[in-house]
Amino acid sequence: MKFSVLKLDVGKREVEAQEIEREDIFGVVDYGIMRHNELRTYEVDPYDPRNIVIFGIGPFAGSVLPGSHRLVFFFRSPLYGGLFPSTMGGAGYQFKNVGVDFVEIHGKAEKPTVIILKNDGEKLSVDFYEIELEKLLDVWKEYKGEEGVYALTQYLLDNLASVFEGMEFRIAVVGPAALNTNMGAIFSQALRNGKRAVGSEDWAARGGPGSVLLRAHNVVAIAFGGKKRKREFPGEDISDVKVAKRVVEGIHKKAQRDVINESTVKYRYNPKLNTGGTFGGNYPAEGDLVPVLNWQMPYIPKEERIKIHELIMKYYWEPFNKESIQPKNWTTCGEPCPVVCKKHRKGHHVEYEPYEANGPLSGSIYLYASDISVHAVDAMGFDAIEFGGTAAWVLELVHKGLLKPAEVGISDVPEFTKDDLITKPVEASEKNAKLVAELAHSIAFGKTEVARIIGMGKRKASKILDEKFKDRLSYGESFKDYGVYTPLGDDGEINPTMYWAIGNFIPLPIQGRYWTFYQFGVFLEPEELAQKIVSSALWEFWYDNVGWCRFHRGWMKKVLKALFMEAYGVSIDMEEHAKKQIRKLIDYLKKAGYEPVFWDSMRVIDLVAKGSEEFGNENWAKKFKEDKIGTAKEYLKRVLDAYSQLIGTEWTL
C-alpha cells in the first residue's frame, strides 16, 4: 500500500516528505517495524536519538466509521526493551488534516522543542518552537493555577492558538515524568472552540513514549492540525456514510447502528448494571478478585476480600454512578463516536485502569481520595498504570520499613493493611492517596536520590536498592519480591494491566497491553492459555496497526478484511500477516538482547500459584502446593513452548 511520510530531524531542523509504497505495509506498526530494523535501533540505548519515534494514523482515518482515528506512537521502550505501540484516542481526527500518514522524529533538539505541523489547505508547514528548560520547569510547576501536562497544554494554547486560526488542531504534550523517569506518557486533550474539552482527555502512555520523546529527542510537545480535508480512498469511498454502512451491514447482516450499539454496550451504558464505561463495568464484574494493596490478594482470605470489594462498591463505584452515569456526563475522545466512553465527574475523566492502579491497588478505596492521587499522577505525565503499580510497591516497602518516607519524598508511613481498609476505609484511603500524590511529584521531579532510582521502574530500581539497602533485607530477600511486573531479559519490565489474569504475567513480545489473554478468574492448561493469547494478540496487532479503538473490536474485527478490499483493493491474510509481524518483533528483541525469563518476583509467583487454587484448577493447585517454584517454571515453559509453536518461532525459557 501507499503511504505519505514526513521525516523530521529536530537537531538539524531538516524536513523531508516522502511517498512509500510497499506490499507488506498496511499501517503504522508495519511501517515502524520496518524503519526500526533499517536503522538498527536495537544496537543503541532507548534514549539514543537514533531511537526514532514514529507516529501517525491508520488507513481508515478519514472514514466515517467510529473508532478509526487513534493516533499511534511506535518506538523502542526504555521499560520493556523492545519495540512498542502506544495509542491515543481521537487525536487522529485532527491529525488527518495535516495531510500525511506517518511522521518520523530523528535527532535531538538543543533545547526543549515543540513541533508544529500545520496544513492550511494549500501546503504543509513544519515549525519548531523552543522553550528554555527553566521556563518549561516553571510551567510544569504552575501556570494559571494548573500543573504538569495541564499547565503545559494551556501555556501552549495561549502561545500557539493563533497559528491555527480557523483550523481544527490538537496539542500532545509530556510532563516532568518524561524528563526524570522511564514511565513518561504523552497527553492530549480534545479542543472545542479553542478551549480544552472537559473529560475528553487521552493518552499514549504504555511503554514510556513520553520519556523517549523528551529524553531521546528533546521534544516536549507536538501541535498539529489544519483545514478540513477529505481523504481519498483509491477504491470505495468510505468517507461516505452510505458506502461505509453498506460494507458493515453486508458483513453483519443487520443495521449498522444496532451492530455498533450492541457490541459496545459495556463502554457506553449497560442497562443490566445501570452503569457504563470501564470503571462502571469492571468493579461489579471482578468482585473479590479486584487487585488491592499492591496485589496482596493471595494473602487475604476470600471473606475479607469480599468485605473490601463491598466497600469499593459503596465508596468507589456508587459515587461514580451518581456523579457520572446518572447525569450522563459522557463525552468522546475527540472523534465523532456514538459510544461516548469518556465518563467524567467534577472535572475528572474516570477510567478503570488509572483509578484502579492509583486507587485500590495503592490503598485508596474512597473515590474522592483517589481523585487527588489520580489527578496528581496524570498531571505529572505518568503512564498511570505503570506509576500506580510502582506507587503501590513503594507504599508497601515504606509500610514494611524497607524504605523510609523521607527517602522517597513522602510525609508519612501509609496505612497499608487489609484491616486498615476494612475498619477505616475513608481515613486510610485519604492518607494513602495523599502519599501517592506526594510520591508522584517526588518521582516526576526527581526530588530525592531514591525517587530518581524508583523512576527507572521496579525491576531496574530493585537491583540498585538490593545493594544500597542490603542490611534491611533478610537472607535471600529482594526488593523485587514485592514488585509486580512482567519481566523480559536482564532488565526489561512492564506493569501488567489491572486484572488478576495469568495471561498478564507471561513474558510476551508486547505486554502490559491487551496482546494477551487477560480474562481474570480463570486458570487454563498452559497450551490452552497460549492458544488464547495468540488468538487475542493477532487481532490486537491489527487494531494498533490501523489505529482503531479496541472498544469497537466487537463489530470491527469481522469488517476489517472487507474494508481493506473495498477501500484499497487489497486482499490480506489477516492472521498470517500478524504472525509474521510478531515474529519480527521477537527477532528485534533478540537482537536487542531480550528473551523470556522466569519470574524473579515472589509476589508474581504467588499470584500465579494462588490463582490456580482460587480459580478452581485443582490439578495445578495441588502441584503448586507440592513444589511452588518448580511448578511455576513448568507452567511458564509450557505456555511459551506452545506460544512459540503457534507463532512459528522460538520464544521460550
UniProtKB/Swiss-Prot annotation:
[4Fe-4S] cluster binds at residues 333, 337, 549. It holds the Pfam family AFOR_C. It is an enzyme of class 1 (oxidoreductase). Binds 1 [4Fe-4S] cluster per subunit. Binds 1 tungstopterin cofactor per subunit. Its EC number is 1.2.7.6. Keywords: 4Fe-4S, Iron, Iron-sulfur, Metal-binding, Oxidoreductase, Tungsten, Zinc. GO terms for molecular function: 4 iron, 4 sulfur cluster binding; electron transfer activity; glyceraldehyde-3-phosphate dehydrogenase (ferredoxin) activity; metal ion binding. Sensitive to oxygen. Activity increased by 58%-93% in the presence of acetyl phosphate, 3-phosphoglycerate or 2,3-bisphosphoglycerate at 10 mM concentration. Inhibited by up to 25% in the presence of crotonaldehyde or formaldehyde at 10 mM concentration. Inhibited by up to 50% by sodium dithionate. 3.5-fold increase in activity observed by addition of potassium phosphate or sodium arsenate at 200 mM concentration. Activity enhanced by potassium chloride, sodium citrate or sodium sulfate at 200 mM concentration. The keyword NADP does not apply. One of its GO terms (biological process) is regulation of glycolytic process. Its cofactor is [4Fe-4S] cluster; tungstopterin. Disulfide bonds: none annotated. InterPro entries: Ald_Fedxn_OxRdtase_dom2 (IPR013984), Ald_Fedxn_OxRdtase_N (IPR013983), Ald_Fedxn_OxRdtase_N_sf (IPR036503), GAPOR (IPR053617), OxRdtase_Ald_Fedxn_C (IPR001203), Tungsten_al_ferr_oxy-like_C (IPR036021), W-dependent_AOR (IPR051919). Belongs to the AOR/FOR family. This is Glyceraldehyde-3-phosphate:ferredoxin oxidoreductase. The lineage of its organism: Archaea, Methanobacteriati, Methanobacteriota, Thermococci, Thermococcales.
